[in-house]
Amino acid sequence: MLSRKGLNMSDEFKITLAQLNATVGDLSGNNQKVMEAWEIARDERSDLIAFPEMFITGYNPQDLILKNAFQKAATSSIEQIAAACSQGPAIAIGGPFCDGDKLYNSYYILAGGKIQAVIKKHHLPNEEVFDEVRLFSSGNVDGPFQIGKMRIGSPICEDAWHSDIVETLAETGAQTLLVPNGSPYYRGKTDIRQNVMVSRVVESGLPLVYLNLVGGQDDQVFDGGSFVLNPGGELVLQLPQFEENIATCVFRKSAEGWLANTGKKSRIL
């Protein structure tokens, strides 16, 4: 199928970024946000809609995540979303994953009415406002997942601040990096994030989608400010800070691999 510009539509891949405000503990409210955003992505004919780190539970859940009943309810909510969204864009969403007596900060890939893959966070932050070592187990490094014609690697937040995870994903066939985050704001944080992510892009030669939460939880403020980088580190999409925003990024296949089209670049602090 050809577009009006004569491009082969099979060489396009659309990712919708859902930069939204999840509420800790409000599984039904967060579920509703997912459904509403998914409908927008479906209308955009996106291939995938992505949500930030631990979105279904809200972040940072602290000791609430240690309650077995809450873990089961969160997993059930993700399963319900998968079943309800079987016809349309795939979904990537953060949530807890239990395996025996181990609990993981994870990223679920939902498609065809089912959970197709679960990515587990490897590097757990244990400093400043984070004490994930107490709450979660460190997962093995997972390879990329396939959605349609694109192989996507998802280092979860802290994992993208270490070169080893991205290196492994690139070596195992990832074509694009999707990084879900719950990254709190402080002055100068945007430049720090982008500099680190540019390093990952240059090292891997892959485009990168950085997706962050927005909103507040206890003493933490999540500023959003999600962005997309092309190989070489070029900034091609910048979402606003401190507000919810849903944006669709169109990737096109070239001889060098997948490249993101240039979109809106919001002013950042």
Q: What does each of the following model-derived ranges do?
A:
Residues 2-269:
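Enzyme catalytic cores with a strong preference for nitrogen-chemistry domains
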